[in-house]
Amino acid sequence: MAAVLTLAASCSIKEDRSPCPCWLSIDFSRCNRSSVTVSAWGEEEIFSERVAVQDYQESEIYEKTVPKGFVNTSVITGEREMKRSGARLIIPMGHDADSIYAHASTVECFGEFAQDTAVLHKQFARVFMSVEIPIGHEYPYTFQACSDVCGIDIRDLSPVEGEFKIDLKLDEENICMFCLPRQRESGGNLKLLIYEGNEVIETIPLAEWINQMGYNWLKKDLEDIYVGVDYAKAEVSISIRGWDDGYSFKVEI
């Protein structure tokens, strides 16, 4: 009797099928990560769950029913410190971005079946900074990176505006590395602040200088950035990984 009731509640061939849900399939065959967070959005969130990719090794297909219409799909991996707030993934103050790889797409789910293929792309830029200090000199300055982008919208991988700030600590070789989230196309208000004690003595307009090099914040996979600070020459240099040329800028330190 239960089976009969279930059948009666579903869509039959003779019925108007427009209210029936759509089966959304997401192909994981190009997703070479151990686990991902899969989400879908219509006017509001439809579902979001953590998935072990290995559980889908045989079929390589993840399936869910969704309401008919346009559906935004999101597949993300690499979350560590960043926190979900609705459709946004936010960087906590004082931290850098997580190493996020992600896929986002708008799928037309108007029929009985729809399909998407998850292809993960690099949503962060590693910034490697090295400081040249003459032997026998003690470096009197500290650094802070700041921006007006504090996260990512998982529905379309666009930047989320908000305060981003991290104190940079040099290692024993006077090198540090931090991760930036995808910035706005212009680079926004990305800056490197140089402090002497509690006073900012120099502001390096990283966004402006990086843009002068032709860096593209809209690329699917963001490139890494190298910043060199030469204390003796009072010079800052910027280069992009894999590029032959770089830029050097004089600063008054």
Language-model-derived ranges and their functions:
Residues 4-32, 246, 250:
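Bacterial Sec-dependent N-terminal signal peptides
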Residues 25-39, 130-138:
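Structural motif
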Residues 36-84, 140-212, 251:
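Tryptophan-paired
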Residues 79-115, 198-233:
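Structured interaction patches on ligand/partner-binding surfaces of diverse proteins
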Residues 117-124:
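Conserved "repeat-terminator" motif of extracellular CCP/Sushi domains
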